[in-house]
């Protein structure tokens, strides 16, 4: 049967292909039992043998200009200052200026000889461990809200599970004492919680937010990890609450939201033993913190996120999303490209390169899919 979809459209509709990770879970009896009292976060084998065991998603909110970062356009440089040589796309009605070449030089890096702009010299030095995809064409979504939803869920229009939710649903979590999907400093705008939500999947698979785009990450906290009650008293309270909730479920029927709430209480209880240590990046050596850029400007905030991301991955978190997000951190540069991108690149370049090198040194990079992406580039 001819579906009328080409390969690229299929990948787009499955949230950049991540939906395939969950196929084994979707077809299995254990996954069908997730909403009826199974163990939804138990680790599961993928449908096909896989190299990657976990995902690190570095999301740059606002739209990094591809032609000023990792996708040089020699013809654009040659035509700098000339009028647009073709009709403007119909979906864009804003005034259009003449062609603008990148103000940054591109250099060849590594044995692979991949070109990277002067904005990212540290990442450039890691280029032999990077696959640069220059052929991707996301969609005709020109507003940040729909574009964010599109890259995070596969649809800018309809409610869909996020990448992390699909991954966790399909593969489960390696550590039952920590959330399987964590989003660091996500924006509360442009789709907000939908960008790390579970949509029609059981709510257990939604992401756990640490911080947000409006708050400096050094002030981000996971609440209720150090309660006043003893573990024994907490256990009694949770067991009582669980029995009452389960009685309600038996009387009223399945309720995904309530089941997720029960699971979240249990997760919060288990997290008290492990999460405080994971969150405490001061346990890292001074040399490691310096390598990431912790304690120095302008790298401190994103360095903290990247270092915590590595600690989470190392502890068995399946999917970690690190967000450079609105409104405090934003790549949107309508009229001030040079200052915007120079400033933002200086904040993320060193931390990302340090994270890649750290993962490689620890033997984690070989089995971690690291994705660096943005919702769209510049035209």
Language-model features: where?
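Ligand-binding pockets and gating/stacking loops
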Residues: 1-379
């Amino acid at each position: 049967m001819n579906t009328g979809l080409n390969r690229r459209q299929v990948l787009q509709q499955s949230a950049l292909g991540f939906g395939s990770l969950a196929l084994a879970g979707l077809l299995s009896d254990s996954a069908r039992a997730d909403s009826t009292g199974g163990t939804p976060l138990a680790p599961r084998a993928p449908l096909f043998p896989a190299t990657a065991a976990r995902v690190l998603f570095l999301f740059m909110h606002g739209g990094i200009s591809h032609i000023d970062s990792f996708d040089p356009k020699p013809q654009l440089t040659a035509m700098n200052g000339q009028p647009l040589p073709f009709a403007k796309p119909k979906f864009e009605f804003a005034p259009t200026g003449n062609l603008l070449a990148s103000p940054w030089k591109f250099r060849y890096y590594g044995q692979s000889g991949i070109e990277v702009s002067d904005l990212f010299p540290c990442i450039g030095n890691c280029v032999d461990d990077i696959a640069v995809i220059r052929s991707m064409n996301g969609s005709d979504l020109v507003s940040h809200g729909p574009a964010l939803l599109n890259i995070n869920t596969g649809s800018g229009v309809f409610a869909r599970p996020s990448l992390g939710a699909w991954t966790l649903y399909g593969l489960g979590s390696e550590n039952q004492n920590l959330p399987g999907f964590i989003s660091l400093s996500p924006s509360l705008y442009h789709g907000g919680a939908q960008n790390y939500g579970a949509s029609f999947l059981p709510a257990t698979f939604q992401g756990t937010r640490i911080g947000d785009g409006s708050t400096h990450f050094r002030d981000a906290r996971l609440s209720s990890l150090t309660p006043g009650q003893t573990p024994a008293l907490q256990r009694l309270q949770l067991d009582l609450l669980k029995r009452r909730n389960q009685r309600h479920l038996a009387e009223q029927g399945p309720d995904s939201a309530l089941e997720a709430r029960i699971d979240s209480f249990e997760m919060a209880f288990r997290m008290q033993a492990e999460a405080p240590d994971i969150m405490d990046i001061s346990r890292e050596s001074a040399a490691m913190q310096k390598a990431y850029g912790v304690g120095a400007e302008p790298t401190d905030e994103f360095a903290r996120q990247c270092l915590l991301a590595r600690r989470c991955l190392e502890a068995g978190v399946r999917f970690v999303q690190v967000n450079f997000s609105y409104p405090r951190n934003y790549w949107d540069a309508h009229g001030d490209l040079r200052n915007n991108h120079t400033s933002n690149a200086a904040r993320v370049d060193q931390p990302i390169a340090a994270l890649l090198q750290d993962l490689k040194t620890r033997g984690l990079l070989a089995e971690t899919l690291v994705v660096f992406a943005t919702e769209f580039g510049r035209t």
